[in-house]
């Protein structure tokens, strides 16, 4: 069920670079917008978007069998 998938996702997240992991966690698990993340972490909005996009594409390759 969903719980197992969530645990699996957390395991996969653990393999991401730490700066990507923080952004994915804030964006998807804590519900912050990209703009909020940019302000909180004091990094440019473009950087937030680029890192999240990179992280998600890497996650996809890890998740695919």
Give the ranges of each region predicted by the language model.
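DNA-recognition helix of helix-turn-helix
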Residues: 41-65
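Short, locally clustered residues in the helix-turn-helix/winged-helix DNA-binding domain
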Residues: 13-14, 28, 60
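Acidic, proline/glycine-rich intrinsically disordered inter-domain spacer in sigma factors
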Residues: 1-14
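The N-cap/first-turn positions of alpha helices
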Residues: 19-20
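A short pre-motif secondary-structure segment
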Residues: 23-27
């Amino acid at each position: 069920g969903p719980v197992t998938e969530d645990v699996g996702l957390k395991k996969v997240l653990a393999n991401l670079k730490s700066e990507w992991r923080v952004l994915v966690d804030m964006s998807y698990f804590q519900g912050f917008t990209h703009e909020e993340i940019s302000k909180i972490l004091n990094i440019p909005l473009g950087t937030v978007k680029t890192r999240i996009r990179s992280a998600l594409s890497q996650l996809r390759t890890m998740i695919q069998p």
